[in-house]
């Protein structure tokens, strides 16, 4: 019997990062020394004290049973405490914190809780592909909000037509931003809250990169702004902050009613995060944060090497204050795919074409600071030898 994919799958382009992995594996199999700047997966190890807590927790048989659907109360209390210390935001751990199997899982399930077939979501572009795909899976439609250099890679809310705004059910935002590295300040979040109130729109803020910042910059939580908790929720992850991408642990916080809806979806789809991983997460959030400071130092060192090198060879990268991404315009005459293909074929460097994140990403590539500083230097040297 021939397998026929569901129509929704036929609408999907190849998943961007899966395609990058495929190309990398193909070149590696041919003996090419590949420098992978394509995927935002930290190369740094999870800190030792977090690993040690996982070991002891995993040896406790009580952690081997099904976890709570909404997360261990101890973990949610820890999240609330971290939000209070880091952002000054008060949260009720029992109703305003929901444990996730990584923030991607929560973001992917979120539209199922808030979007009906035919509803409209306001989705930034270029952006993490999950926002649009999850909306489509829920039967919704995306209205794309361009993120362009001239507006600081922030969506221009004033340009959204009134009839679109009235139809919109949810707005996705993400700051510090993937892929552009842009950041948002209080005035932008205030506009978002006012827009949400005027048009009765739910705000979904992906805040996975707030702890990956440089030079003393402290990114805001959306929930620091008055009224934010009335209109939206914020998604966070331990993946980037503590180098725990493979552990799959995150959380959503904010409006209790919205989180209850997401929790209802999750309880019918998954069985929660492994309790031993949640205990390790508590150690991460409550333990010495020196590991976060060290992570920031390492990425800043790599960032400086890459930015200086790109400028030296005639490119004009955006200089981020946060995230571990560099958003760099392509040389004149090159499309995003053309330039990323040149880097791959001629230099063995994997960089992500900006167009893969959405049409306004055309003319850019994204490079991730996820190799050590010597490999960053090597990547710059290989690029210097190219003709473009």
Swiss-Prot record:
Listed EC numbers: 2.6.1.83
UniProt xrefs under PROSITE patterns: AA_TRANSFER_CLASS_1
Catalytic activity entry: (2S,6S)-2,6-diaminopimelate + 2-oxoglutarate = (S)-2,3,4,5-tetrahydrodipicolinate + L-glutamate + H2O + H(+)
Pathway stated in the Swiss-Prot or TrEMBL entry: Amino-acid biosynthesis; L-lysine biosynthesis via DAP pathway; LL-2,6-diaminopimelate from (S)-tetrahydrodipicolinate (aminotransferase route): step 1/1
Residues engaged in binding substrate: 15, 40, 104, 128, 178, 366
Superkingdom of the source species: Bacteria
EC category name: transferase
GO terms, molecular function: L,L-diaminopimelate aminotransferase activity; pyridoxal phosphate binding
Cofactor field: pyridoxal 5'-phosphate
UniProt keyword annotation of Cell cycle present: no
Residues noted as binding pyridoxal 5'-phosphate in the record, renumbered to the chain: 69, 103-104, 128, 178, 209, 237-239, 248
Keywords: Aminotransferase, Pyridoxal phosphate, Transferase
BP-aspect Gene Ontology terms: lysine biosynthetic process via diaminopimelate
Alphabetical list of SUPFAM superfamilies matching this protein: PLP-dependent transferases (SSF53383)
Known function: Involved in the synthesis of meso-diaminopimelate (m-DAP or DL-DAP), required for both lysine and peptidoglycan biosynthesis. Catalyzes the direct conversion of tetrahydrodipicolinate to LL-diaminopimelate. Can also use m-DAP instead of LL-DAP as the amino-group donor.
Subunit description: Homodimer.
Family the entry assigns: Belongs to the class-I pyridoxal-phosphate-dependent aminotransferase family. LL-diaminopimelate aminotransferase subfamily.
Name of the protein described by the UniProt record: LL-diaminopimelate aminotransferase
Organism the protein comes from: Syntrophobacter fumaroxidans (strain DSM 10017 / MPOB)
